[in-house]
From Swiss-Prot:
Official protein name in the record: Putative protein-lysine deacylase ABHD14B
Organism: Mus musculus
GO CC terms: cytoplasm; nucleus
Subunit structure: May interact with TAF1.
Keywords recorded for this protein, A-Z: Acyltransferase, Cytoplasm, Nucleus, Phosphoprotein, Transferase
Main location: cytoplasm
Location(s) in or outside the cell: Cytoplasm; Nucleus
Entry superkingdom: Eukaryota
Catalytic activity, as annotated: L-lysyl-[protein] + acetyl-CoA = N(6)-acetyl-L-lysyl-[protein] + CoA + H(+)
EC nos: 2.3.1.-
PANTHER family assigned to the protein according to its UniProt record, in alphabetical order: PROTEIN ABHD14B-LIKE, PROTEIN-LYSINE DEACYLASE ABHD14B-RELATED
Protein's gene: Abhd14b
UniProt feature coiled coil, ranges: none
Active site: S111 (charge relay system), D162 (charge relay system), H188 (charge relay system)
Length: 210
């Protein structure tokens, strides 16, 4: 991959082995900051590799790390810290960030991964540079006070053909510092339906972060 370094490996988080893929600028080029990519129940870190998101991020100067969540992808043997659909302790994603030395990262969180990202987002003292929720679950499990306390800039993304995107937005719009990207004609995995629009919106958002 020209101009980009990539590798994959396994980290141990709270006693569980998690698979990850990492892509960063090549040839010792400086890194702006890190981006942690999560995924939905039917997907894995491979989704972001195949879509070209990892490469696009690295080419733009970011360290991009995509993990396979517990019980999914190549982390299938790892036990999840909470049942699917229930918020996991914020400490889980904090441990991922610490182990991979990402902090403070931008977190990209589609669908299922909301059970991990939202508790991390609202945890007191959480270190996050930015948050990109893509129609995540568990938005109804966070209260208004916690949403209002979040200072992290957010880019809320969803497809206009996705009912889950619309319903999650009704909660996420309580985040004080947010902008919205609605993709016309796109469904639940809107980044797959409109990859060019996804990459442009994401990179524009990242460019505006310190």
């Amino acid at each position: 991959m020209a101009g980009v370094d990539q590798h994959e490996g396994t980290i141990q988080v709270q006693g569980q082995n998690l698979f990850f893929r990492e892509t960063r600028p090549g040839s010792g080029q400086p890194v702006r900051f890190s981006v942690l990519l999560l995924h939905g129940i039917r997907f894995s870190s491979e989704t972001w590799q195949n879509l070209g998101t990892l490469q696009r991020l690295a080419e733009a100067g970011y360290r991009a790390v995509a993990i396979d969540l517990p019980g999914l992808g190549r982390s299938k043997e790892a036990a999840a810290p909470a049942p699917i659909g229930e918020p996991a302790p914020g400490s889980f994603l904090a441990a991922v960030v610490d182990t991979l030395e990402l902090g403070p990262p931008v977190v990209i969180s589609p669908s299922l991964s909301g059970m991990y990202s939202l508790p991390f987002l609202v945890a007191p003292g959480s270190q996050l540079r930015g948050f990109v929720p893509v129609a995540p679950i568990c938005t109804d499990k966070i209260n208004a006070v916690d949403y209002a306390s979040v200072k992290t800039p957010a880019l809320i993304v969803y497809g206009d053909q996705d009912p889950m995107g619309s319903s999650s937005f009704q909660h996420l719009k309580q985040l004080p510092n947010h902008r919205v990207l609605v993709m016309e004609g796109a469904g639940h995995p809107c980044y797959l339906d409109k990859p060019d629009e996804w990459h442009k919106g994401l990179l524009d958002f990242l460019q505006g972060l310190a």
